[in-house]
């Protein structure tokens, strides 16, 4: 089952933008808190609540892994992933 998350994405040399991503709950291997990066400050300038939490997730895709910064605390992301599994 896929879970919809909101990713903070910043292509090299460009501004941060928000994008919806759908990930398989079984493909997420780690979730950790993300704070203090300049990308987060740019995101807050886009209108994201200043109290919002962010997490960095690791996604396993066909033998390769990639990371993504998403909106939500690690507990919130885990709850979304677990909701799909139950």
Predicted regions and their residues:
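Acidic, Ser/Thr- and proline-rich intrinsically disordered linker/docking segments
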Residues: 2-3, 9-86
């Amino acid at each position: 089952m896929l879970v919809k998350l909101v990713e903070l994405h910043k292509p090299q040399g460009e501004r941060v933008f928000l994008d919806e991503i759908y990930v398989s709950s079984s493909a997420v291997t780690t979730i950790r808190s993300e704070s203090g990066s300049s990308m987060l400050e740019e995101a807050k300038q886009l209108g994201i609540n200043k109290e919002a939490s962010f997490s960095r997730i690791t996604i396993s895709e066909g033998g390769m892994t990639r990371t993504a910064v998403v909106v939500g605390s690690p507990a919130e992301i885990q709850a979304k992933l677990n909701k799909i599994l139950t």
